[in-house]
């Protein structure tokens, strides 16, 4: 199928949007994301929250987000916004960059999916199922899952190369051929499956909460005058707020990653089409804009948590208070 003619004005506009987005928008996004990850890590490592298995997943999630920001968004800012790309001059840097980006791009949603499964366990009406939500299981899942994905993406350290596209124009990417086809389909499957699993787990947790609502009210009312009852209410409140924070993360991820999923579907559908240079340039611009959109969920978690969780706001206020920072009693 032949390409549809595209005007030079359209290409110029798209390139300008892409350039200014990464020159000014992405550094701002990185700054916001850095603050978000730091505050999240400070809050979730506080004594009141770190004993909860879901908080352990959130800690891993924010560590992955922080590394992704400085491996992917920083590299995109320099290469797209300022035409600075060290990875096209050194093969080791090229391979390390691709490996880090692909690894932490999957680890962040993976940790969110683990947290979603933990919320399914803790909101189950079955007491034995709820008991499976433990810190030991959280550490085990994080360690095994991280090792699995680290080994799975080892191909990026082996089958990536620097390709010359034109005179003085180089690209650090996966080797053309079977490996590139594999990576293309993997990216599509990864995005669609991550999105689907998050939505399914989120809806499942909501269903569990609704089905347990009446039972929890009866239990809390019957023990409200005892110390144990107060602890049950406190723990239940923390679990609910962690659930709300998780659901907000899922909504944000789904909203901004959906655009990139659509682009990947389009890319696979049109991979055999004959495309002229102008259309390739347009698609490259769209891809970079979609990558910017897909990077937003890695940078906004803290601000969503501040909106939906009273406990998070309280702990954040304590953690960043001047008395605490200056170690004043």
What label would you give each PLM region?
Residues 2-13, 81-104, 130-138, 149-199, ...:
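Loop architecture of class A 7-transmembrane GPCRs
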Residues 32-45, 59-62, 72-73, 102-127, ...:
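Cytoplasm-facing ends of alpha-helical transmembrane segments in multi-pass membrane proteins
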Residues 26, 30, 67-84, 105, ...:
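Helix-to-loop junction signature of class
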Residues 195-203, 249-265, 285-329:
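Seventh transmembrane helix
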Residues 207-260:
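Intracellular effector-coupling site of seven-transmembrane GPCRs
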Residues 29-33, 60-72, 141-153, 191-195, ...:
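Alpha-helical transmembrane segments of multi-pass membrane proteins
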Residues 15-28, 54-116, 120-125, 130:
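Extracellular TM2-ECL1-early TM3 structural module of rhodopsin-like
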Residues 1-38:
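Extracellular N-terminal segment of 7TM GPCRs
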């Amino acid at each position: 199928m032949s390409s549809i003619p595209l005007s030079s004005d359209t290409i110029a506009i798209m390139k300008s949007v892409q350039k200014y987005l990464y020159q000014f928008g992405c550094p701002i996004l990185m700054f916001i994301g850095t603050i978000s990850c730091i505050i999240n890590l400070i809050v979730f490592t506080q004594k009141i929250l770190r004993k909860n298995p879901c908080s352990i997943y959130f800690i891993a999630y924010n560590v992955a987000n922080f590394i992704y920001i400085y491996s992917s968004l920083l590299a995109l800012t320099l290469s797209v916004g300022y035409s600075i790309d060290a990875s096209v001059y050194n093969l080791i840097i090229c391979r390390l960059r691709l490996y880090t980006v692909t690894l932490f791009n999957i680890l962040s949603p993976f940790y969110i999916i683990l947290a979603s499964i933990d919320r399914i366990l803790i909101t189950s009406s079955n007491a034995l199922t709820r008991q499976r939500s433990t810190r030991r299981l959280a550490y085990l899942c994080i360690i095994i899952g991280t090792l699995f994905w680290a080994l799975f993406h080892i191909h990026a350290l082996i089958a990536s190369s620097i390709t010359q596209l034109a005179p003085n124009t180089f690209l650090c990417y996966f080797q053309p051929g079977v490996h590139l086809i594999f990576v293309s389909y993997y990216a599509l499957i990864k995005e669609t499956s991550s999105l689907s699993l998050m939505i399914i787990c989120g809806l499942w947790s909501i269903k569990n909460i609704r089905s347990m609502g009446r039972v929890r009210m009866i239990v809390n009312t019957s023990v409200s005058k005892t110390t144990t009852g107060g602890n049950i209410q406190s723990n239940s409140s923390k679990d609910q707020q962690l659930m709300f924070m998780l659901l907000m993360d899922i909504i944000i991820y789904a909203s901004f990653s959906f655009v990139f999923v659509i682009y990947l579907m389009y890319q696979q559908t049109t991979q055999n089409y004959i495309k002229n240079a102008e259309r390739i340039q347009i698609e490259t611009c769209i891809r970079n804009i979609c990558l910017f959109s897909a990077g937003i969920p890695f940078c906004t978690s803290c601000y969503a948590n501040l909106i939906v969780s009273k406990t998070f706001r309280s702990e954040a206020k304590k953690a960043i208070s001047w008395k605490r920072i200056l170690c004043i009693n």
